[in-house]
Amino acid sequence: MAKETLGRLGLGALVGQWSKLTNILESHITGDPTLRFQSINEVDANALFKEPYSESRMLELLQSPYADIQNFALHNLYRNDYPGISDLLRKTFETSSFMMVRFTCLALLEKISDKNFREVLHLAITDSYEFIRRTSVRMMQHVGLNEYVYPQIKAYVEDNLSERVAFNVSLGLQVFDQAAVQAAIDKVMAETYVLQDKEEMRKVLENANNSRSMQKELLSKETSERCRILYCNSLKNHMAHACVDGLLALLTDSSESEKLKTCLLEAFAWFTHSYRKPDILRVCDQLRKDKSLSENLREEADRTYYRLKN
């Protein structure tokens, strides 16, 4: 949000108006919310922000030559439940020449988390703006569909000047099905125009794909409970969609400890974009209604259920 809105200061917005939309400490500018800069353009963002919401006005502002004004309009349309907002965001992402407008569209589509969001990720990973490419990799890994494996492997091999894109790819391959990742590696290596360091890249990718010991140890009853809980917490950052079936079986296994199940339910609350969310919701609904379980476990299942559902 900080990047999306910073340009409004140059159009006359108050620092306070800007900071209301910015929730990260690194973006602090000054403690005086009334500070503003005089706009050198015909736009007065201060006056614009004071206008009452009007759908037609926001749609009109989408034609502004300023990316910051377009972003303002998109956020307002989203917050006010504009009908067709998802289609509008997708179309704008596909057609806008402004990288920050495209990023705004992607960020808002992530909040909606529908078919348009999942499909636009295929475009985002080849966007000209590195931050969008890097962000799309994270989003793909949060969704977990195997159809995202090939474009990520291709980006790792052919987008070889973007180190952070490559890092994000290698860090999250383990959340996908192992066989799908290996198949994508083989396919990309057979097709790519890249000749230099191919075998070295293959080795790095295959090592990343085979680094699944934490998932295996989490599912193993031979692992200490302390380590299993530690591995559960790691699922909040790396949603292991490939082993969701095993994790759901753990939740319904009467021989597993309540402490471990509670920790796993808490971790599942982070699977907000996962394609396995319906399965997680089904089991959480079952657990929260099971009167034979402890109140603590049912409450945790209830919290996760409503976080994912809403």
Q: Where do the language-model regions lie?
A:
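Caspase-like cysteine protease fold
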Residues: 4-83
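Amphipathic alpha-helical scaffolding segments comprising HEAT/armadillo-like alpha-solenoid repeats
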Residues: 52-61, 82-93, 114-125, 146-157, ...
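Short inter-helical turns and helix N-cap capping residues of alpha-solenoid HEAT/ARM repeat scaffolds
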Residues: 65-66, 97-98, 128-129, 160-162, ...
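Catalytic binding pocket for nucleotide-activated donors in carbohydrate/polymer assembly enzymes
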Residues: 1
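Long, charged low-complexity terminal regions
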Residues: 184, 197, 211-216, 224-231, ...
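Structural detector for internal amphipathic alpha-helices that build alpha-solenoid repeat scaffolds
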Residues: 70-80, 91, 102-114, 123, ...
